[in-house]
Amino acid sequence: MPVLRLPKFGKPVKYAYITGRVRAMKTKLIPNEMYARMLNMDIPEIARYLEETQYKEEIDALAKDYSGAELIEHATFANLAKTYRKLLEVSIDEPQFLILEYLRRWDIWNIKTILRGKFYGASDSEIMKYIVPAGELDQEFLEGLAKKDSINDVITAFEGTDFAEALSKYDGKSLASVENALDKLYYFRMERAVGGTLSVGGGLLLKYVKREIDIRNLITLFRMNKAGIEASIVQENLIPGGKLSEELSRMAGQPYADFVRGLEGYPFWSAISDVATADLDSVSRIEARLKAYLIRYAWSLSNYHPLSILPVLGYIVTKETEVANIRKIVRGKEAGLPNELIEEQMVVA
């Protein structure tokens, strides 16, 4: 497995080609207004609608083996992986490097998915349903991991790699510490690699990533402060490297009402001010609002830098959100949830 690279691109990078490709790909995204219509469809109707979109190839190919919600889940993840691989294929030099560094989050997703599957005794075929080979770890390698007999066997497969230290946190009782360590590893590697390029493109991506870290930490604070978890434990779960890391760390363990009042005035406050109340029952609506804010932030940055990595990043996060929304709708319908409950968990930017 390759070690972390730190290239220093010395020449101006031409982003016209990759941003042009992304503009064309963006036109194929599902319009936001379609989500409301999908909420009023049954699962077979949703599948038929998706056959008329960029998901047609995957729906048709997988229909012989799956049906219903399972078909849609497989098809959307397969399409997501294909789309991200296409971005890597049509990019070169700095754009390709930055895209790959960002997409390494899917390596983390896949490792977590395999560990969880082994922890709960899932079969390798069940685990592979949720694998998205969109990062550096390829399908064959991931299938090999899914076939391992135990969590320890999976961990052993990463000896000598950047993942080894994070995976060593596994205590045999819970996956929480190792998952937290993997998340921190991703952002540490990301900041080190992207910051190491010393390029304008790397700097722009780093600016977004710092905001992403802040939003992830904010969601963690909402969940843990709402649950009354003590400050030291909350702080252990926060990811370093955000622009607001020190300020958010000081909010760990605060009484929930005080914590919410302390958020007023921050850039993200307007996105959540009407739902971040002291009597909040569920954090899911706040999480959806914050993720939508992050997408808008990515696109707003790209407006100032149209020939940069940012339009590509905006597309990447929007595409991921599209797949997540489709899956939430389908899972919710399969579980018989009311539309209102499904809708509040969806991210619409």
Swiss-Prot record:
GO terms for cellular component: plasma membrane; proton-transporting V-type ATPase, V0 domain. GO terms for molecular function: ATP binding; proton-transporting ATP synthase activity, rotational mechanism; proton-transporting ATPase activity, rotational mechanism. Keywords: ATP synthesis, Cell membrane, Hydrogen ion transport, Ion transport, Membrane, Transport. GO terms for biological process: proton motive force-driven plasma membrane ATP synthesis. It is a peripheral membrane protein. It is found in: Cell membrane. Its main location: membrane. The keyword Cell membrane applies. It comes from the Archaea. Component of the A-type ATP synthase that produces ATP from ADP in the presence of a proton gradient across the membrane. Belongs to the V-ATPase V0D/AC39 subunit family. Has multiple subunits with at least A(3), B(3), C, D, E, F, H, I and proteolipid K(x). This is A-type ATP synthase subunit C. It comes from Methanothrix thermoacetophila (strain DSM 6194 / JCM 14653 / NBRC 101360 / PT) (Methanosaeta thermophila).
